UniProtKB/Swiss-Prot annotation:
The keyword Chaperone does not apply. Keywords: Aminoacyl-tRNA synthetase, ATP-binding, Cytoplasm, Ligase, Nucleotide-binding, Protein biosynthesis. Catalyzes the attachment of proline to tRNA(Pro) in a two-step reaction: proline is first activated by ATP to form Pro-AMP and then transferred to the acceptor end of tRNA(Pro). As ProRS can inadvertently accommodate and process non-cognate amino acids such as alanine and cysteine, to avoid such errors it has two additional distinct editing activities against alanine. One activity is designated as 'pretransfer' editing and involves the tRNA(Pro)-independent hydrolysis of activated Ala-AMP. This is Proline--tRNA ligase. One of its GO terms (molecular function) is ATP binding. Belongs to the class-II aminoacyl-tRNA synthetase family. ProS type 1 subfamily. Homodimer. One of its GO terms (biological process) is prolyl-tRNA aminoacylation.
Length: 566
C-alpha cells in the first residue's frame, strides 16, 4: 500500500482527554478517531490491526471445533424477560422502543438469542455437543466511558456458546476453549494470565478471566508468589485464621466523636488500632437490606456478599435508605441496637475482636469496648472481605501479591441457568427430557487491540508484534525527488510484496523528519530506509522493537528481512 493513498491523519500533540498510552497513541498514529464519548471509528491502519486479531481468533476458534454464525444486534425484550435479565442486568443495557412501542435491547451479550435459536432446532442428544460463535459489535451504556477502546459504549466482541448433553462434555469443550484463548493471546504477543473469576450478571459457575498485565488495568489480580494460583481479587477466598485475645471484656461505653467519620479518623481520635474497629455497611441484596461487618483494616467484598445470598443484584444502600433504616448517617453506622428483623452478617475476623469500637447509630458518637455476641448478634460469620497482599495464598502455597490487569477474555460454565429459564430442552439417550447444559466464551476483540497497544509502545510510538502489525515492512525513500531513491524504493516495495510481505511505501513528498516520526508512530516491525547510498545499492534496515539498524545490500535484503520476521 502506498502511503500517499491512505487516510492516516497523525497528531503531533497528545489529545487532552486521552489518559493512557494506548488511547493516546492510537489517536496520534491515526488508527482511530472518536465520534462520541466511548464511540470510535477505526481508520484504515487500525482496521487492519483489528482484522488481524479477528483472523487469529477465527483460526483458533475453528481449530477448537467452533462454527461461526451471526446474530442480530437488536434483541426483543421478551427474550430477556424470559431469562429474567431484563430488569436484573441494570442500566448498562441499552434499551429502545420501535414505532409500535415494542421494547428492544441493543445486544451487550447474546445468551438469550442463542438459547432461543438452539431450543427451536436441537431436540436430541445426537446433535450435541454444539459450539457456535460470532464476531459482532456489542453495546453497553457505560456511565463513564474512559481509556479509549478499553471501556467504550460500542465495541467488537467475539462471543461463543456451547451446548451439551452432559457435564463431562461441557468440561471437555471448556478445557479446549480455555486452551484456544491461551493460544489467541499468546499469538497476539501479550503478557497475560488466566485467573479465577466471578460470573457476574452472566450467571453460572466455574469461570476464568484472561487478564493482560498492565498498570492501567481496572482489575486487580491476586496471585501467589510461589505457586500458579491467580484469581480476580473479587473471587480470592481468605483462608486466614484469627485468634481471639484473652483480654477481659470491659463495660460498653458511648463516647463523643465529633466530625470523625472514616475508620482512620475514628481510630486516631480514640487511639484505637483500626483492626479493633468494626466497619459497618448497609447493602441492598436484591430487595433486602442487610448490615455487613468487617474489621476496620479490611474492605467489604460485595461479590462475596452477593454469593452468600445467591443474589442477582447487590449494591450499597442509599443515604436515604440508611437514614430510614437506622436514623443515622453513614459515618456513624454500627451493629448495636439494630432491630431483629434486619440481618447482620460479619466477616470471620470480626468474631475475634475484643473491646473494639463501632458506630453508635447516632451522629457524632461511637461505642468503645464493643464485643460481638455480647453487645449484638450476628446471624452468620463467613468470608466477606477482600484478600490483601501478604495474606496466605488460598491454595496454601506462598503469600498473595497483587498485579493490575486488563480483562480481554472470559469463559463461563453456565450450566442450565438459561436453558431452564427459557425451557431449552433435549431428549437424552433414554428418551428423557433434560435442559441443555451451556457454556459461553467471550473475547473483547477491539479491547485486545488496545491491550496490545498498551503493552507494546515506547516514547516514540507504537511497536506492533508482527502477528498483528498493519504491515510487516515500512519502505521509506528519503527523497522522492531522487530518481535512484524513488525507483529503488518502488522496486523493494514490489519485490517484498511478491514474497508475501505486507508493505507500506512512504511515497509522500515530505521531509525525512516527518517520515521517520510517522514511521515510529505507526510502529511497523521493520523499516527499510532508502537514502543517499541508493546509488551503491545499499539501504538501512531498522528493527522497530529493538532500535537496531544495519546497512544491507539490496540483493541480500529479502533474506535479511526473512530472518527478522521468521
Amino acid at each position: 500500500m502506498k502511503q500517499s493513498m491512505v487516510f492516516s491523519p497523525t497528531l503531533r500533540e497528545v489529545p487532552a482527554d486521552a489518559e493512557i498510552k494506548s488511547h493516546q497513541l492510537l489517536l496520534r498514529a491515526g488508527f482511530m478517531r472518536q465520534n462520541a464519548s466511548g464511540i470510535y471509528s477505526f481508520l484504515p491502519f487500525g482496521l487492519k490491526v483489528l482484522h488481524k486479531v479477528e483472523r487469529i481468533v477465527r483460526e483458533e476458534m475453528e481449530r477448537a471445533g467452533a462454527v461461526e454464525l451471526l446474530m442480530p444486534a437488536m434483541q426483543a425484550s421478551e427474550l430477556w424477560q424470559e431469562s429474567g435479565r431484563w430488569y436484573s442486568y441494570g442500566s448498562e443495557l441499552m434499551r429502545m422502543k420501535d414505532r409500535n412501542a415494542r421494547e428492544f435491547a441493543l445486544g451487550a451479550t447474546h445468551e438469550e438469542v442463542i438459547t432461543d435459536l438452539v431450543r427451536d432446532e436441537i431436540k436430541s442428544y445426537k446433535k450435541l455437543p454444539l459450539t457456535l460463535y460470532q464476531i459482532q459489535t456489542k453495546f453497553r451504556d457505560e456511565q463513564r466511558p474512559r481509556f479509549g477502546l478499553l471501556r467504550g459504549r460500542e465495541f467488537l466482541m467475539k462471543d461463543a456458546y456451547s451446548f451439551h448433553a452432559t457435564q463431562e462434555s461441557l468440561d471437555e469443550v471448556y478445557s479446549g476453549l480455555y486452551k484456544a484463548y491461551s493460544n489467541i493471546f499468546a499469538r497476539c504477543g501479550l503478557n497475560f494470565r488466566a485467573v479465577i473469576a466471578d460470573s457476574g450478571a452472566m450467571g453460572g459457575k466455574d469461570t476464568h478471566e484472561f487478564m493482560v498485565l498492565s498498570d492501567v488495568g481496572e482489575d486487580t489480580i491476586a496471585y501467589s508468589d510461589t505457586s500458579d494460583y491467580a484469581a480476580n481479587i473479587e473471587m480470592a477466598p481468605v483462608v486466614a485464621t484469627y485468634t481471639k485475645s484473652d483480654e477481659a471484656e470491659k463495660a460498653l461505653e458511648k463516647v463523643a466523636t465529633p466530625d470523625q467519620k472514616a475508620i482512620e479518623e475514628v481510630s486516631a481520635f480514640l487511639n484505637i488500632a483500626a483492626e479493633k474497629c468494626i466497619k459497618s455497611m448497609v447493602f441492598k441484596v436484591d430487595a433486602k437490606l442487610v448490615v455487613v461487618l468487617v474489621r476496620g483494616d479490611h474492605e467489604v467484598n460485595d461479590v462475596k456478599v452477593k454469593n452468600v445470598y445467591g443474589a442477582s443484584v447487590v449494591e450499597l444502600a442509599s443515604h436515604e435508605e440508611i437514614k430510614e433504616l437506622l436514623n443515622c448517617e453513614v459515618g456513624s453506622l454500627g451493629p448495636i441496637g439494630v432491630t431483629g428483623d434486619i440481618e447482620i452478617i460479619a466477616d470471620h475476623a470480626v468474631a475475634s475482636i475484643v473491646n473494639g469500637c463501632s458506630g453508635a447509630n447516632e451522629e457524632g458518637f461511637h461505642y468503645v469496648n464493643v464485643n460481638p455476641e455480647r453487645d449484638f448478634k450476628v446471624s452468620q460469620y463467613t468470608d466477606l472481605r477482600f484478600i490483601q497482599e501478604g495474606d496466605q495464598s488460598p491454595d496454601g502455597n506462598g503469600t498473595i501479591l497483587f498485579a493490575r490487569g486488563i480483562e480481554v477474555g472470559h469463559v463461563f460454565k453456565l450450566g442450565t441457568r438459561y436453558s431452564e429459564a427459557m425451557n431449552a430442552t433435549f431428549l437424552d439417550e433414554n428418551g428423557k427430557t433434560k435442559p441443555l447444559i451451556m457454556g459461553c466464551y467471550g473475547i473483547g476483540v477491539s479491547r485486545t487491540v488496545a491491550a496490545i497497544a498498551e503493552q507494546f509502545n515506547d516514547e516514540n510510538g507504537l511497536v506492533w508484534p508482527k502477528s498483528v502489525a498493519p504491515f510487516h515492512v515500512h519502505v521509506i525513500p528519503v527523497n522522492m525527488k531522487s530518481d535512484a531513491q524513488r525507483e529503488m524504493g518502488e522496486n523493494i516495495y514490489n519485490s517484498l510484496q511478491e514474497q508475501g510481505y505486507e508493505v507500506l511505501l512512504d511515497d509522500r513528498a515530505e521531509r525525512a523528519g516527518v517520515k521517520f516520526a510517522d514511521a515510529d508512530l505507526f510502529g511497523l516491525p521493520v523499516r527499510v530506509t532508502v537514502g543517499k547510498k541508493a546509488d551503491e545499492g545499499i539501504v538501512e534496515v531498522k528493527v522497530r522493537a529493538t532500535g537496531e539498524s544495519e546497512e544491507v545490500k539490496v540483493e541480500e535484503l529479502q533474506t535479511y528481512i526473512a530472518n527478522i520476521l521468521k
